[in-house]
Design a protein with these regions (language model features):
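Hydrophobic faces of well-ordered beta-strands that scaffold small-molecule active sites
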Residues: 5-7, 35-37, 91-93, 112-114, ...
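Active-site mouth loops of central-metabolism enzymes
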Residues: 6-19, 67-69, 90-92
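Conserved, mostly hydrophobic/aromatic
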Residues: 8, 27, 104, 163
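Catalytic domains of carbohydrate-active enzymes, especially glycoside hydrolases
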Residues: 22-38
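Active-site beta->alpha loop and helix N-cap motifs at the rims of alpha/beta catalytic domains
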Residues: 59-116
């Protein structure tokens, strides 16, 4: 694979399609090849206790209201899909659970992405690998053993993949960079 530049949008759109489109436009203007989002089924990723806990936000007073305010559903992803096609930029998303991966399968994204926090979720890895779609696998929050297990799953299903060694805290200080790890993965 040649150099491929992807702009991480994640949930930085704040649940607002106009902000989302501005971020896609900025990625296009910057010469990016793709934009990436994050998709979660809140009831699969978080506990009821956590979702019910207090959190003041523009969307309400609980974690659930805040998290739900940041999530896009089918109509928004259909709009993202069309907007990216119209602007000749790829898009894909990291699914944080099985339901979200199944949701994303209805779109014709070139790539899958595994978030480093999900590298220990074997059912999710298997579901993604079975698609045999080129997959970017983040390793920033993982042990070498976790990485080896994931690689084994993707090789078993003959799914092409790329290991990425990001740092999972933003911004990262120079002293916390783990660049030598790139040689290991």
């Amino acid at each position: 694979m040649s150099i491929y530049i992807c702009a991480e949008i994640g949930i930085n759109h704040n649940g607002d399609m106009s902000i989302c489109k501005q971020l896609i436009d900025a990625a296009c203007e910057s010469g990016c090849d793709a934009v990436k989002f994050q998709k979660r089924d809140l009831d699969q990723v978080y506990t009821q206790e956590f979702l019910d806990s207090p959190r003041e936000s523009p969307w309400g007073t609980t974690q659930r209201e805040q998290k739900a305010g940041l999530e896009f559903g089918l109509s928004e992803y259909q709009e993202i899909d069309q907007y990216c096609k119209d602007n000749n930029i790829d898009w894909y998303a990291s699914a944080w659970d099985l339901n979200s991966q199944k949701f994303l399968q209805q779109f014709d994204c070139k790539y899958n992405k595994v978030a480093s926090a999900m590298l220990v979720h074997n059912k999710l890895l298997k579901t993604i690998a079975e698609e045999k779609k080129y997959t970017f696998i983040s390793t920033g929050m993982s042990t070498l053993k976790d990485i080896e297990k994931a690689v084994k799953i993707f090789r078993k299903f003959k799914c092409p993949f790329e290991l990425m060694n990001p740092h999972s805290a933003y911004p990262v200080s120079y002293t916390h960079l783990t660049l030598p790890t790139i040689l290991l993965v």
